Amino acid sequence: KCYMADTGLLISHAFDEKIIQGEELYQKIMLDKLEINSGMIVENIVAQMFVASGHRLYFYSNNSRTNADDRMEIDFLVEKPQLTNAHNICPVEVKSGKNYTTVSLNKFCKKFERQLFTPYIIHSQDLKIDNGIVFLPIYMTSLL
């Protein structure tokens, strides 16, 4: 995966100036009517926050053609500095929408449960814990 160090610059490069002018772009952002892959933008923001917090960026991807149970992608793997019973890897999924699934995270946790610490989903909603997964608002990313 490749992330841009400046998310603002990424957004400005994502639009052709001839298609959307400055004021129109800002209005669309403010009214949540922007036709863009918001998942890419939010994932880039999270990557930028992880780097600013001193984390190295790792991810997991398996595109198995033979076994659907092995097909999964995890946006980030965060290494915790302390070992707790040999579990110091936290899988992190980033979700930009209000409705989403956790299929990849669930498969990953089941497959690698012995090596994992706490799984996280970073999203635009409130903080909660459900079935052992911590759901963090985006603004709390730097606390990982």
PLM segments and residue spans:
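Accessory nucleic acid-recognition modules appended to NTPase machines
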Residues: K1-I74, V78-T84
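Switch/connector loops and helix/strand junctions flanking conserved nucleotide-binding motifs
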Residues: S12, T101-T102, K128-I133
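A structural signal for isolated positions on well-ordered beta-strands in alpha/beta enzyme cores
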Residues: Y58, C90, T118-I121
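Active-site-adjacent loop/helix micro-motif of nuclease/hydrolase catalytic cores
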Residues: D69, G97-K107
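Short polar/acidic secondary-structure junctions
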Residues: P81-T84, G97, L127
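Arginine/glycine-rich "motif VI" loop of SF2 helicases in the C-terminal RecA-like domain
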Residues: T84-N85, F108-F117
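Active-site ExK catalytic segment of metal-dependent nucleases
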Residues: H87-N99
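Domain-level recognition of nuclease-like catalytic cores that cleave nucleotide substrates
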Residues: I122-L144
